[in-house]
Amino acid sequence: MPDFITIAIPKGRILQDSVALFKKIGIDCEELLSDTRKLVFENQEQKMRYMIVRATDVPTYVEYGCADLGIVGKDTLMEAEKDLYEPLDLKFGYCRLMVAEPVELSSKDDPSAWNNIRIATKYPNVTEKYFAAKGIQVELIKLYGSIELAPLVGLSERIVDLVSTGETLKQNGLAEIETIAEITCRLIVNRASMKTKHERISKIIEGLEQHI
């Protein structure tokens, strides 16, 4: 429906924070928080549509125009490298993309001497670029969850993963070594939609900007 604005949002805490933020600018989408298996919601009165998708898929839905807008972590954008407009840092969902290793290794390790190291991560593209810029060769193992397990069972020496409080790392005997990036959620926009629906999208962007 060309007169609708479609927004792709992932489940979880990002969804809750997004709904709260939209409410501040008069966009009512609290239905998204209901206990349902629905993936698409429509508000006919406000001409808004919402898609609930995996966080890693948000940039793809926006890039291909299935969604006009999306809300997603900067980590996902860095890894995906899609051709998108990124007008706003929404200032929520803060965490850090970190290099970590076992505590016993960190006590005697010298990161400046690293070379040919094996790293497990959900972010192979970001990780490879980070270490290439430092002139360090790495062997990357892509995992999709429980990254902290990799050093414990000998799959990798180190990991690159998102860290919020650091408690999960500590419980698994891992220490933070280097910060690759500080991460927050971003508003992203399909480039064609920004032109064809410029007035409505600009109004949303301006409204959000006043509340972050």
From Swiss-Prot:
Reaction equations catalysed: 1-(5-phospho-beta-D-ribosyl)-ATP + diphosphate = 5-phospho-alpha-D-ribose 1-diphosphate + ATP
Name of the protein in question: ATP phosphoribosyltransferase
Keyword terms: Amino-acid biosynthesis, ATP-binding, Cytoplasm, Glycosyltransferase, Histidine biosynthesis, Nucleotide-binding, Transferase
Cellular compartments per GO CC: cytoplasm
Disulfide bonds: none
Coiled-coil residues: none
InterPro entries: ATP_PRibTrfase_cat, ATP_PRibTrfase_CS, ATP_PRibTrfase_HisG, ATP_PRibTrfase_HisG_short
Subunit structure: Heteromultimer composed of HisG and HisZ subunits.
Source organism: Citrifermentans bemidjiense (strain ATCC BAA-1014 / DSM 16622 / JCM 12645 / Bem) (Geobacter bemidjiensis)
EC number: 2.4.2.17
UniProt cross-references to Pfam families, sorted A to Z: HisG
Enzyme class, spelled out: transferase
Ribosomal protein is among the record's keywords: no
Signal peptide limits: none
Subcellular location: Cytoplasm
Family: Belongs to the ATP phosphoribosyltransferase family. Short subfamily.
Domain-related comment: Lacks the C-terminal regulatory region which is replaced by HisZ.
Entry's Gene Ontology BP terms: L-histidine biosynthetic process
Keyword Zinc: no
Domain of life, source organism: Bacteria
Functional summary from the UniProt entry: Catalyzes the condensation of ATP and 5-phosphoribose 1-diphosphate to form N'-(5'-phosphoribosyl)-ATP (PR-ATP). Has a crucial role in the pathway because the rate of histidine biosynthesis seems to be controlled primarily by regulation of HisG enzymatic activity.
Principal location class: cytoplasm
Pathway(s) it belongs to: Amino-acid biosynthesis; L-histidine biosynthesis; L-histidine from 5-phospho-alpha-D-ribose 1-diphosphate: step 1/9
GO molecular function, one term: ATP phosphoribosyltransferase activity
